[in-house]
Amino acid sequence: MIGRSEMTSALVEELRIWNTPVIGAYLIYRFVKTFAQERPDKRPPDLIMLCLAIAVLSDRRLSNNIRLRRGISSFRRYLEGEKNAVAFDGIHDVVAKTLPYTLAAIDIGLACGIVRVNAESATIEAVDFRARKGTNEIITDAITDDVKIIETLAKWFAKYENSSVVADKLEVLL
């Protein structure tokens, strides 16, 4: 029989690695918000960019090498390394594998009201909301590294016109 503390630590570990779409919804909110803030035209990202970001974030070998100061070109050079190419070769599979998770996270974000769909542009937009005092800190403290990574990806992706350019920069076939 599993003790209570073992169950609690297992649950905390599962949440820490953002294995639930609820945390994914918050990460998508942060990605969409940061992406739009970085764009001169304030345009939100398309679904393909969200799928790429979640796929990169879900693979710890890739996400652990993302740093804002280095930029997307440095990340691409990292991927081109002999050992790292194997990690990135499967990104198409990772995108396909994480698609149900990404869609579930978007669905939860829509249900909670932190993101909305713009039917005219077919994009997902962040909704400004005021969390109760202290709530945001509790959420972000638990997943600080993931928030930094997802915001870095948003800043990188926002520099390019569309998802095809981002995919080309990362040498991903869409």
PLM regions and their residue ranges:
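A glycine-rich, hydrophobic loop/mini-helix early in the fold
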Residues: 45-82
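Minor-groove-contacting beta-hairpin "wing" of winged helix-turn-helix DNA-binding domains
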Residues: 122-127
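Glycine-rich, aromatic-bearing surface loops/beta-hairpins
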Residues: 130-174
